[in-house]
A protein has these predicted regions:
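A short, histidine- and acid-enriched strand-loop-helix "catalytic/donor-clamping" loop
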Residues: 63, 93, 103-119, 131-134
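Short His-centered aromatic/hydrophobic patch
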Residues: 86-92
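Conserved donor-binding/catalytic core segment of Leloir-type glycosyltransferases
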Residues: 186-202, 208-212
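N-terminal subdomain of nucleotide-sugar transferases
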Residues: 1-42, 50-53, 130
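Carbohydrate-associated surface elements
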Residues: 39, 141, 162
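A short, basic/aromatic alpha-helical/loop segment that forms part
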Residues: 14, 165, 199-204, 217
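A short helix/loop element that forms part of the nucleotide-sugar donor recognition site in Leloir-type
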Residues: 169-185
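A structural motif in glycosyltransferase catalytic domains
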Residues: 21, 28, 192, 207-208
Length: 218
């Protein structure tokens, strides 16, 4: 199956969603994938280093406007695309119900939670989701929020963010012990690691509060 990803968030533009998408798409068969996105600094060099096809628009941002609809449809026909994947579902995914090709959406968190709680945008998001042939979510939370906004069960595939195992590998026992000692931790001390931006919606404050409640137990 050949499919087209339409997104505003793709490397070399930096960010969590960009990294999530790239880690997915770089692992797919290169001859089955086309990515449509906007230009970002350094894109020429980046695109040359990738195995899969990347098409850059002349416009600086993708919006559900007639020019983008035309370009998506042209790529669908020229590349024999079977499925169009949109990220985010709103606003880019609003093209899905307007075009004849089957489509799906990719959901992470805030881009479904925020419009899903505002009456006007919730109805738009709900329509996009209900008409999707596939909904890819990064976890159970995104799935629940999507189905709440849609008001029904959805054809969901949960694909959590992965880890580049070639870049990030467990330390050997000796280095691990030395690193723990550097931070005043013994070999059997419990360690909870979270990696995130410190913004309210990500709930790091809740983790800190929970850790304080456990200080006498650990």
């Amino acid at each position: 199956m050949r499919h087209l990803l339409v997104t505003n968030d793709y490397p070399p533009k930096f960010g969590g969603i960009q990294n999530y998408l790239w880690e997915l798409y770089r692992r797919l068969p290169a001859d089955e994938v086309v990515v449509l996105t906007h230009p970002s600094p350094g894109w020429e060099r980046w695109d040359k280093a990738q195995d899969h096809s990347i098409v850059r628009t002349r416009q600086p941002v993708l919006l559900p406007e007639p020019w983008l609809a035309r370009q998506v449809q042209e790529l669908v026909e020229a590349e024999s695309i079977d499925l169009v994947m949109y990220d985010p579902a709103v606003p880019v995914g609003m093209l899905g119900p307007r075009l004849p090709a089957p489509y799906g959406v990719i959901l992470h968190g805030a881009e479904v939670t925020v419009p899903g709680r505002i009456p006007g945008s919730r109805s738009v998001l709900g329509e996009v989701l209900r008409k999707s042939a596939l909904v890819v979510t990064a976890g159970d939370y995104s799935t629940r929020e999507a189905e709440r906004a849609a008001g029904t069960k959805l054809p969901v595939a949960v694909i959590p963010p992965g880890v580049d195992c070639e870049r990030f590998t467990p330390l050997p026992a000796g280095e691990r012990a030395a690193t723990r000692a550097q931070y005043g931790l013994s070999a059997d001390d419990l360690v909870v690691l979270t990696l995130s931006r410190l913004v309210p919606r990500k709930g790091m404050d809740k983790l800190i509060d929970a850790a304080a409640l456990l200080q006498h137990d650990y």
